């Protein structure tokens, strides 16, 4: 709104509110009419200005669009110029290549001129050689005429000889003759062969046939065969013997069998049906009553065909004089002992005496080698346990071992058990109980027991 119009409206409002419009009521209508006209004029002016602004905005937008089109056209022109510059560079390269090609073409033309000069020389040589060839052809023509005369003179002789061959030549042959590759051959079966230039009969080996004195002979054993009335027969001595043996066989021949006997017609074997639960054939081929042996359990066993106590079930005593070896954490030492060994039933008891050793670790092994040192009647295998190395340990016990460095020993409780037996060497495990600084160890007497093997 126009500022002057605004001030006029404010002034009128103040005047109206001051005396309820009484003083201004007379001139108000004319002034309001004037204000309405002024407002209408201002509205028309604002409308024209607004329309002018819209037209100006449209023209600005059109100008901006034209500017964008011009920018795009300039970019296209720059791109086209760049392409033209590239094409000009390529044309320059082609022109340079054409210059090089023209130079090479000039060199090749020079070479062609040199080659044409050489071709002229070769042409002259060819002309000379053609002249020589013409002279040689004339000589050959003369020789060919001479050869024609010779062939004509020989033709009559050849015709006469060919006629003679046609009259006398063999062109076909009857069986067993045949013509193959201008040769006449004869077909022979397996019974005939050629011996030199003669036809002979083929006689296979070991048939008794032989050709001798122009005839076919048959050879036979005169001790067993003879010829009677042109027939080959057995001699009486041979025939009578065979006849006698056949008669004896017929008399002893078993044609059938009665139960419990059975005759197998396919194998010609006579056997007997038996109840295998009560009868059996012994090692002598005799029929015996089957004896039922009871299932014996240890210590009862079959002893020499009878029932008795197992030989392993008894008390045996012996001695082992050998070396006890200790090893553990780099410590190794050996001592010799005399040990009593007792075998009672299925257990073996090894009584080790007290002995003095050297330094031991917190855990180590005692090894007893039974390969040597066992006194009769025990053998190395008698010490084999029922196990070799198992999770189950035997002979577990606690032993008090005195450790010292020359003074009074201090006893440590160690756990000892059977760990392994291999190839006659029994290994005992000793560990636990702690340790002190020492150089000597005092081992008590102890007994190691474990079940032994019966294999």
Curated annotation (Swiss-Prot):
Chief subcellular site? virion
Q: Which residues form a coiled coil?
A: 116-148
InterPro entries per the record?
Adenovirus_pIV-like_att (IPR008982), Attachment_protein_shaft_sf (IPR009013), S1_C (IPR002592)
This chain is glycosylated at 231, 264, 282
Q: Which UniProt keywords apply?
A: Capsid protein, Coiled coil, Glycoprotein, Hemagglutinin, Host-virus interaction, Outer capsid protein, Viral attachment to host cell, Virion, Virus entry into host cell
Question: GO terms for biological process?
Answer: cell adhesion; symbiont entry into host cell; virion attachment to host cell
Which compartment or compartments is the protein found in? Virion
Region: Tail, residue numbers: 1-307
Is Coiled coil found in the keyword set?
A: yes
**GO cellular component term of the entry, any:** viral outer capsid
Q: Keyword Chloroplast: yes or no?
A: no
- Report the SUPFAM superfamilies cross-referenced here: Fibre shaft of virus attachment proteins, Tropomyosin, Virus attachment protein globular domain
Q: Where is this region: Head?
A: 308-455
Segments traversing the membrane: none
- Describe how it is modified after translation: Undergoes dramatic conformational rearrangements during viral disassembly in the endocytic pathway.
How is this protein organized at the quaternary level? Homotrimer. Interacts (via the head region) with human F11R.
Q: Into which family does the record put it?
A: Belongs to the orthoreovirus sigma-1 protein family.
User: What does the protein in this record do?
Assistant: Fiber-like molecule that attaches the virion to the host cell membrane by binding to the primary receptor F11R/JAM-A and to sialic acid containing proteins (coreceptor). The interaction of sigma-1 with F11R is required for NF-kB activation and apoptosis. Binding to both sialic acid and F11R is required to induce maximal levels of apoptosis.
Mind telling me what this protein is named? Outer capsid protein sigma-1
Q: Origin organism of this chain? A: Reovirus type 3 (strain Dearing)
């Amino acid at each position: 709104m126009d500022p002057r119009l605004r001030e006029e409206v404010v002034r009128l409002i103040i005047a109206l509110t001051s005396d309820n419009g009484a003083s201004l009521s007379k001139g108000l209508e004319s002034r309001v009419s004037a204000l309405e006209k002024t407002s209408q004029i201002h509205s028309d002016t604002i409308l024209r200005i607004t329309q002018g602004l819209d037209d100006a905005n449209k023209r600005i937008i059109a100008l901006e669009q034209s500017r964008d089109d011009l920018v795009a056209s300039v970019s296209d022109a720059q791109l086209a110029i760049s392409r033209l510059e590239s094409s000009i560079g390529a044309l320059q390269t082609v022109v340079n290549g054409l210059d090089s090609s023209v130079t090479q073409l000039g060199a090749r033309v020079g070479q062609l001129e040199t080659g044409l000069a050489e071709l002229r020389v070769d042409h002259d040589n060819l002309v000379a050689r053609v002249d020589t060839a013409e002279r040689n052809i004339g000589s050959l023509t003369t020789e060919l005429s001479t050869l024609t005369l010779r062939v004509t003179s020989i033709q009559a002789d050849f015709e006469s000889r060919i006629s003679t061959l046609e009259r006398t030549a063999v062109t076909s042959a009857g069986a067993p003759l045949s013509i193959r590759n201008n040769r006449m051959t004869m077909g022979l079966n397996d019974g005939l062969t050629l011996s030199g230039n003669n036809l002979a009969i083929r006689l296979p080996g070991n048939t008794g046939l032989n050709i001798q004195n122009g005839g076919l002979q048959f050879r036979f054993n005169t001790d067993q065969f003879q010829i009677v009335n042109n027939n080959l027969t057995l001699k009486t001595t041979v025939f009578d013997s065979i006849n006698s043996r056949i008669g004896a066989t017929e008399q002893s021949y078993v044609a059938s069998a009665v139960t419990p006997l059975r005759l197998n017609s396919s194998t010609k074997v006579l056997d007997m049906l038996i109840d295998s639960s009560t009868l059996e054939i012994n090692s002598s081929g005799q029929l015996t009553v089957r004896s039922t042996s009871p299932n014996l359990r240890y210590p009862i066993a079959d002893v020499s065909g009878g029932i008795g106590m197992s030989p392993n079930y008894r008390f045996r005593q012996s001695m082992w004089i050998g070396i006890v070896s200790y090893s553990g954490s780099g410590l190794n030492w050996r001592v010799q002992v005399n040990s009593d060994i007792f075998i009672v039933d299925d257990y073996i008891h090894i009584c080790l005496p007290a002995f003095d050793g050297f330094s031991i670790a917190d855990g180590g092994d005692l090894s007893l080698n039974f390969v040597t040192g066992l006194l009769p009647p025990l053998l190395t295998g008698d010490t084999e346990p029922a196990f070799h190395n198992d999770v189950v340990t035997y002979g577990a016990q606690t032993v008090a071992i005195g450790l010292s460095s020359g003074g009074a020993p201090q006893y440590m409780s160690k756990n000892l058990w059977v760990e392994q037996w291999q190839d006659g060497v029994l290994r005992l495990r000793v560990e636990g109980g702690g340790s002190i600084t020492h150089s000597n160890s005092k081992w008590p007497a102890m007994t190691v027991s474990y079940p032994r093997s019966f294999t």
